[in-house]
Amino acid sequence: MADLQAEKKLVLNYFSEIDSCDIESLTEVISKYASEDFSMKCTHPFNELGSADIVANNLWRPIKDSFSPIQRRLDIFYAGINSLDKNKGKWISSMGHFMGVFNKPFVGLKPNNKSILLRFAEFYKVENNKITEGAIFLDVMNLMQQLGLSIIPQSSGLVCVTPGPMNHKGLKFNTSNQNESQKTLDLIHRMRDRLVKGSKMQSYKEELELDWHNDMIWWGPGGIGASYTIDGYQKGHTKPFQDGLEFVRFNGHILSSAEDDLGGWFGWPNLIMKPKGEYLGLTNASDIESEMRVVDLYRRQGDKLAENWIFIDHLHFLKKLGVDLLERAKFLNQ
């Protein structure tokens, strides 16, 4: 695994300038750090964006304009070589919250003029000292829950502000032990293969116990919430997930990397699923297939996994099933 300190510094400087610049300077800042063919994959309703100007005006302008002043609160930051790209791609992965005062409408959501925490996961590929592509997952459904919108049914897990790693060592600003990084990557790949290839997205306790500590914590996305212990995870997530959805196929990931005890991936989409019943209290059984864009970040403790942070682009997934939560929110505003 390569030394990626220069790539870390580049992305940290990018974060600093994006967060501190005025809105009219966004395109200039992005152009300074990004390649000419820079593009981003974003959760709905932003979706796929190309060019510095489009990313500036379609993504960062509404974020900075709606939640002002914005503060980036990082809980996870690490670098790794993409194991899915012939071990060539250099990627920076991060997670945390954007804090701000919600004082202007955001994706049609009515502001409450109070402080909010917008949960995010962000990924950037760096080549030749330029950011060439990126992805950002915003947990808009969690924001809806913070706002108390009635369109979101009660979650099966704990709804809370998602913390970072329990050991408070989520920010890998310095170099890490390459052997520990490889251990993490091997473990999450073993767990992935057991779940996807062996069990077809079915989670059995005896298999979970092979890869997870019993007191694991599953920090789920908006609409689901967090679960504690293997038993709690099965009750709060896997049973409702398996009861409500039918697995169609696994599409793979775009990125899979690790550094020290942290690792993870994202896909676009990772999974194709269709509802076989009620999922999140919002779907009915149908033959319509829909795409799940998912982020999974993990913390390894010893030879098993201890924590998992998840983002699911539920707005995109549900819209393809005829459930448009942003339109429902606009109706509430009226």
Across the structure, where does each feature detected by a protein language model lie?
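C-terminal and inter-domain tail/linker signature
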Residues: 1-334
